[in-house]
Amino acid sequence: MSHILDKIETVYPFPPKPIPLSQEEKADYIERIKKLLKEKDAVLIAHYYTDPEIQALAEETGGFVGDSLEMAKFGNRHPASTLIIGGVRFMGESAKILTPEKRILMPTLEAECSLDLGCPADKFSEFCDAHPDHTVVVYANTSAAVKARADWVVTSSIALDIVEHLDAEDKPIIWGPDRHLGSYIAKKTGADMLLWHAECVVHDEFSADALRKMKNVYPDAAILVHPESPASVVELADAVGSTSQLIKAAKELPQQQMIVATDKGIFFKMQQLVPEKELIEAPTAGAGATCRSCAHCPWMAMNGLKAIEKALSEGGAEHEIFVDEALRVKSLIPLNRMLDFAEQLNMQVKGNA
């Protein structure tokens, strides 16, 4: 059983799209970035939702492409003293939480996440204080301050197991911040959950009606859906899962066409694994409606070559991530609780968004 809070009105100030670079400019920035990575003892770590050229550069230079938790864990293990995180701000914070001794740079600190923006730490903490009998479970797509208020931090692949574990102990749960993922988990587990009311601007736009029409055009296609999508979209899926799980599903499912309902940045890695298959963007918005994100996170798009070069060459307060040490230690507790639980289950934690 789930109870959804009244919607908190949050205005998401979408950033302007980066000015496109010419091929010559791209080549120049790529060469400069490669040189700077060596000079600064740095490694580029990119999320699946960044632009393909950023993911390609990360792989070419010995970096990494993955989900947010995989990114933080890779950075923790890598010998480089500086990590440049291609993603959104909470991902840089996660890297700093797990690897405090390293310098964490981001192309821009203005790369936000609507789930993070939709869950202000002060308001969320007040709500938690009003329900002291509830166990607080938060999605990884949150600020360090929200993580510090939680009992558990979860990723989408382990969330069901953790909620089932808590439900077996008859513990009521506060879930934040993604209402769609929370509803999906509540439906699957039957747990008593109070859901914070925020959503991912990308996944919230996927339309069940439009998806049905697309399925009519591609009747043999499999539908892959991230659980941050509305329930009506999830119900149409052949496979539901996190970014890493969807990539795995694309490889394992027999269909040769895949309709993919998540950020289209994922196509870069997915196509690498299934070059023989046709990947199709799931439709956003509805009939006559205009999409806002259009299946690509506007903040992820801020991680351009120019911004990466500037972060490496200039650094400074506009690019470096700092997390208060007391807050870092506190937020590490629920994160380690998840990692320990996953180890007990003998499973590999694969991440969120």
Curated annotation (Swiss-Prot):
Pathway assignment: Cofactor biosynthesis; NAD(+) biosynthesis; quinolinate from iminoaspartate: step 1/1
Catalytic activity field: iminosuccinate + dihydroxyacetone phosphate = quinolinate + phosphate + 2 H2O + H(+)
EC number: 2.5.1.72
Residues that, per the record, bind [4Fe-4S] cluster: 113, 200, 297
Localisation: Cytoplasm
Pfam families: NadA
Transmembrane intervals: none
Cofactor(s) for this UniProt protein: [4Fe-4S] cluster
GO CC term, one of those recorded: cytosol
Residues where iminosuccinate binds: 47, 68, 139-141, 156, 226-228, 243
NCBIfam families xrefs: nadA (TIGR00550), PRK09375.1-1 (NF006877), PRK09375.1-2 (NF006878)
HAMAP family: NadA_type1
Sequence similarity: Belongs to the quinolinate synthase family. Type 1 subfamily.
Protein name: Quinolinate synthase
